[in-house]
Amino acid sequence: MAAAVRVTAARARLRVVVRSLHAGVRSLCTQPVSVNERIENKRQAALLGGGQRRIDSQHKRGKLTARERISLLLDPGSFIESDMFVEHRCADFGMAADKNKFPGDSVVTGRGRINGRLVYVFSQDFTVFGGSLSGAHAQKICKIMDQAMTVGAPVIGLNDSGGARIQEGVESLAGYADIFLRNVSASGVIPQISLIMGPCAGGAVYSPALTDFTFMVKDTSYLFITGPDVVKSVTNEDVTQEELGGARTHTTMSGVAHRAFDNDVDALCNLREFFNYLPLSNQDPAPIRECHDPSDRLVPELDTVVPLESTRAYDMVDIIYSIVDERDFFEIMPNYAKNIIVGFARMNGRTVGIVGNQPKVASGCLDINSSVKGARFVRFCDAFNIPLITFVDVPGFLPGTAQEYGGIIRHGAKLLYAFAEATVPKITVITRKAYGGAYDVMSSKHLCGDTNYAWPTAEIAVMGAKGAVEIIFKGHENVEAAQAEYIEKFANPFPAAVRGFVDDIIQPSSTRARICCDLDVLASKKVQRPWRKHANIPL
């Protein structure tokens, strides 16, 4: 319901923007007399982009223009544009002609606010040379990225570009490299978000890949290094744009994109909501908002949520929703590597990162894709001071030749590395299974977890009872009795609790209250690491 209200309000704002742009176009003077009039004419030309015909064409595709997108993303009246008068510098192939000069070139850049918080933004304008990147276009983007780094504010890129501007040759390629360099320099310093709202091909794809989060719009956005025609000529594969690089491909198969939205308005509204979870920079604490959900709220339904039979599945997402503030959970990559859950929520108003195994998918086993998905998310949270809460129900790593040949050892080590390296507050709740090496990996006490809880249903052991009995009691006459003995000794939380590997065995209903209390205590946590140039994560 709330999302529908936001979309309705956004569409109303959009109508106002379109009317104001059209009014500006009607007032356009073609015979400048003074410098002031010339300035105003240039300004109006910049607002018009590639012209009304191209704007109409953009709308017919179900897409907004670059300026309409900025207007919906930012708070009303907060956008301050920079470099509106910049034009490309190419003189070859007829580009020097006045008809090929557009104030602002093919990107709109500047700063504004989202819910009162500073953000820098660039929005590529497909109505001008298909949004292609020129040297001037890249210069504008680099300038706002430099400014964002200087003041400590996030950068959001609204991508809608045909790629490099061929007429400019190597200058266009140099422009991409300039942007990539800044993406890398800003990584872990300020949040970087890419929203793909049209084509993004060739060299253009690497900037979104270097940012922290990449979102897409269904049916109108595409990400690929080489398009369908090149694929056909090289590999003889017949593939459509949507199949090769559409939103479904990248949110369910490749893992390149983190979420996909129905249309431009839906994407921009969700991006505003997502932005609220993030700090402005690595020097700022995670945002805290007023909370009306009691921090000591008990959740009685959690006492019976885990089935008595250890082989029966349940939905870890239900547990997450019931514990976080007001059941508000922004899941990241919900359709990729579904055996692990990651996303943002709030606990007593404080932003937290959630990681959880999903027993409904592959019994919650860790595999290559889920390990990489989890590791990337954990490292983002650690870089930006966001506490981590981990819900564990993991029977181990997924066995099989496909996983071994694919490098599960190396990829699984990424998740282990991420949790071990993280110095933010780390709270872990073992809901049921925590077997073998996967137990260690999932933010265990041994990886410097700050607070580690177990529910009464927790089973912390090297492996499940059946497999263990087959090894320990091989040839034993009474296998059932042996299995019962193993369960009594190991398939429960007590062995770990006795050794201090879990801090407490808690009633599930008290989980929210315990976590909120722990977060208050851990808010002042500080960890000093030995100096090093950079770590060498097993990429």
Swiss-Prot record:
Complex and partners: The holoenzyme is a dodecamer composed of 6 PCCA/alpha subunits and 6 PCCB/beta subunits.
EC number: 6.4.1.3
Family statement: Belongs to the AccD/PCCB family.
Record-linked InterPro entries: AccD/PCCB, AcCoA_carboxyl_beta, ClpP/crotonase-like_dom_sf, COA_CT_C, COA_CT_N
Activity dependence on pH, as recorded: Optimum pH is 8.0-8.2 for the propionyl-CoA carboxylase activity as measured with the holoenzyme.
Keyword set, alphabetical order: Acetylation, ATP-binding, Ligase, Mitochondrion, Nucleotide-binding, Phosphoprotein, Transit peptide
KW Hydrolase (keyword) present: no
Ranges where the record places region Acyl-CoA binding: 325-358
Pathway stated in the Swiss-Prot or TrEMBL entry: Metabolic intermediate metabolism; propanoyl-CoA degradation; succinyl-CoA from propanoyl-CoA: step 1/3
Modified positions (Phosphoserine) in chain numbering: S71
Sequence positions bearing N6-acetyllysine: K99, K474, K489
Listed name of the protein: Propionyl-CoA carboxylase beta chain, mitochondrial
Ranges where the CoA carboxyltransferase C-terminal domain occurs: 294-533
Signal sequence extent: none
Location in the cell: Mitochondrion matrix
GO cellular component, one term: mitochondrial matrix
